[in-house]
Amino acid sequence: MTTKKSSYTYPIFTVRWLSIHALAVPTVFFLGAITAMQFIQR
């Protein structure tokens, strides 16, 4: 299992990590904002 492939896929800070967080953080923020707006209106 200890091959060059493991060292290639081991780093967490990759393009996939950036893309997931770039999409996840705004979605969580917008969902929280939408729910807060709905509770404030009522």
Curated annotation (Swiss-Prot):
InterPro entries: PSII_cyt_b559_bsu, PSII_cyt_b559_CS, PSII_cyt_b559_N. With its partner (PsbE) binds heme. PSII binds additional chlorophylls, carotenoids and specific lipids. It is a single-pass membrane protein. Keywords: Chloroplast, Electron transport, Heme, Iron, Membrane, Metal-binding, Photosynthesis, Photosystem II, Plastid, Thylakoid, Transmembrane, Transmembrane helix, Transport. It is found in: Plastid, Chloroplast thylakoid membrane. Heme binds at H21. GO terms for biological process: photosynthetic electron transport chain. Its cofactor is heme b. The keyword Kinase does not apply. The chain crosses the membrane at residues 17-33. Its main location: plastid. The keyword Zinc does not apply. It comes from the Eukaryota. One of its GO terms (cellular component) is chloroplast thylakoid membrane. GO terms for molecular function: electron transfer activity; heme binding; iron ion binding. Heterodimer of an alpha subunit and a beta subunit. PSII is composed of 1 copy each of membrane proteins PsbA, PsbB, PsbC, PsbD, PsbE, PsbF, PsbH, PsbI, PsbJ, PsbK, PsbL, PsbM, PsbT, PsbX, PsbY, PsbZ, Psb30/Ycf12, at least 3 peripheral proteins of the oxygen-evolving complex and a large number of cofactors. It forms dimeric complexes. Belongs to the PsbE/PsbF family. This b-type cytochrome is tightly associated with the reaction center of photosystem II (PSII). PSII is a light-driven water:plastoquinone oxidoreductase that uses light energy to abstract electrons from H(2)O, generating O(2) and a proton gradient subsequently used for ATP formation. It consists of a core antenna complex that captures photons, and an electron transfer chain that converts photonic excitation into a charge separation. This is Cytochrome b559 subunit beta.
